[in-house]
From Swiss-Prot:
Protein name: Enoyl-[acyl-carrier-protein] reductase [NADH]
Keyword line: Fatty acid biosynthesis, Fatty acid metabolism, Lipid biosynthesis, Lipid metabolism, NAD, Oxidoreductase
InterPro entries recorded: Eno_Rdtase_FAD-bd_dom (IPR024906), Enoyl-CoA_Rdtase_cat_dom (IPR024910), FabV-like_NADH_b (IPR050048), Trans-2-enoyl-CoA_reductase (IPR010758)
Residues involved in NAD(+) binding: 48-53, 74-75, 111-112, 139-140, 244, 273-275
Species: Pseudoalteromonas atlantica (strain T6c / ATCC BAA-1087)
Keyword Metal-binding on entry: no
Gene expressing this chain: fabV
Active-site residues per Swiss-Prot or TrEMBL entry: Y235
Subunit text: Monomer.
Length: 393
């Protein structure tokens, strides 16, 4: 069938197999063109491996360092009449490229929060990899089932403490408008921490340590976004921010429990980008459209793959990586520095319905959004019939 994007609200409900494969190939090509990346990981577990920063981490590990990779993700398979999710096609493309390079790659599809999927991952690592020397935690989910109690927790995107009114951009209706968000109650904050905090990251590391699958000196990192004043009320100082603070707690706990193995655990703060997660957050489409404009003009714009390649070479596997006062690895400085933020703030204050497309790089935002689902990718013929079926072997 010929596949065109079906957009509903902030998500695209279908995906393009060839477009996803082309996007993965572009990222692999970028990493392969970077030359020798130096010493790095050899056996990598990526939890949340199929899109965005998690997929980029898997690509850098495999094609930058020649590492064996095990991915864990939760994707919907295709049928003859319905496309799979983008992450399914990304993973199929990754497997094909890895196989051609003679690299070990396996992927487990299921709920990473569950005990069953952790057990499957442990069996696979024992059988195929021995031990892992890098664990990437890059999950984004709106809900989590507690593996002990079966209780379902749901995350909310709300400010903490007081109501918040600000500008936002409705991608569906192409309009700038004010949005008012009521503050979260204690239960909503607690549930968001359960879903998006560090508990599950810690449980993964506990399970791997118990099975003696963490190599001496193994590194692990969970990804976060910290941002600055413009996004703090909905991000840093909001329910998501509270959950992300819990990652700092988890990092310290992981290090403390695994001292004899010299395990290093970091929270890594990355720049704001169009991802399936960020497009769902109020304010972010407007903010990202503006930072794309400013950072492209400054020559500092980067996508997922450039950010992760930099994280690995300049921070995670550097001799003595620079840490912030909370002990985090920071890759967001080109966005969060005062000069860049001042330019974004000036645009933010000026932007209206009438001048939005002129002041922002919404065209760039929309292109990246479509690309998440395999659409608007350079060199792909979108009039060509597509086979929706794609496998991971």
């Amino acid at each position: 069938m010929v596949i065109k994007p079906k957009i509903r609200g902030f998500i695209c409900t279908n995906a393009h197999p060839e477009g996803c494969a082309a996007s993965v190939a572009q990222q692999i090509e970028y990493v392969s063109s970077q030359g020798d990346l130096g010493s790095g990981p050899k056996n990598v577990l990526v939890i949340g491996s199929s899109t965005g920063y998690g997929l980029a981490s898997r690509i850098v590990s495999a094609f930058g360092y020649g590492a064996n990779t095990l991915g864990v993700c939760f994707e919907k398979a295709p049928s003859e009449r319905k496309t799979a999710t983008a992450g399914w096609y990304n993973t199929a493309a990754f497997h094909k490229e890895a196989k051609e390079k003679g690299l070990f790659a396996q992927t487990i599809n299921g709920d990473a929060f569950s005990k069953e999927i952790k057990a499957q991952a442990i069996e696979t690592i024992k059988r195929e990899m021995g031990q892992v020397d890098l664990v990437i935690y890059s999950l984004a989910s709106p809900r989590r089932t507690d593996p002990e109690t079966g209780e379902v927790y749901k995350s909310t995107l709300k400010p903490v403490g007081q109501a918040y009114t600000t500008k936002t951009y409705d991608t569906d209706k192409d309009r700038i408008h004010d949005i008012s968000l009521e503050p979260a109650n204690e239960d909503e904050i607690a549930q968001t921490i359960k879903v998006m905090g560090g508990e599950d990251w810690e449980l993964w590391l506990d399970a791997l340590a118990e099975a003696d699958l963490l190599a001496y000196g193994c590194k692990t990192t969970a990804y976060t976004y910290i941002g600055k004043e413009l996004t703090w009320p909905i991000y840093g100082q909001a329910t998501i921010g509270k959950a992300k603070e819990d990652l700092d707690r988890a990092a310290a706990a992981i290090v403390s429990k695994n001292q004899e193995k010299h395990i290093e655990a970091y929270v890594s703060s990355l720049k704001a980008l169009v991802t399936q997660a960020s497009s769902a957050i109020p304010v972010m489409p407007l903010y990202i459209s503006l930072i794309y404009k400013v950072m492209k003009e400054e020559g500092t714009h980067e996508g997922c793959i450039e950010q992760i390649k930099g994280l690995f070479t300049e921070r995670l596997f550097a001799q003595s990586p620079a840490l912030d006062e909370q002990g985090r690895l920071r890759m967001d400085g080109k966005e969060t520095n005062e000069a860049t933020q001042a330019k974004i703030k000036a645009l933010w204050d000026q932007v209206t319905q009438e001048n939005f497309h002129e002041l922002s790089d919404y065209a760039g935002y929309h292109h990246e959004f479509l690309k998440l689902f395999g659409f608007d990718v350079e060199g792909v013929d979108y009039e060509k019939e597509q086979n929706t079926l794609a496998d991971w072997d």
